[in-house]
Amino acid sequence: MNILSVEVSHISSHGVWLLTQTEEMFMSYADFPWFKNQPIQAILNVEEPSPNHFYWPEIDVDLTVEMINHPKHFPLQAIAASEFH
């Protein structure tokens, strides 16, 4: 695995930018709520275990380029811990 093949290039109040070898992609917190309110280090710790597949081990999130580029095709949303009661 090439650790330089993917990196988080920016974190803002609106979302996270992910830089790959071929493109930069934006993940809004509205579409990717798992990243909101996470420690910066957990968001920065991203791996690419296989081409176009990204994994954040500290928050146990797996995403593909397709999911990031077309989040409406994958409507599964995170459930806040408070909703499990």
Q: Language-model segments: what does each one mean?
A:
Residues 1-85:
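Motif-centric detector for short Cys/His coordination patterns
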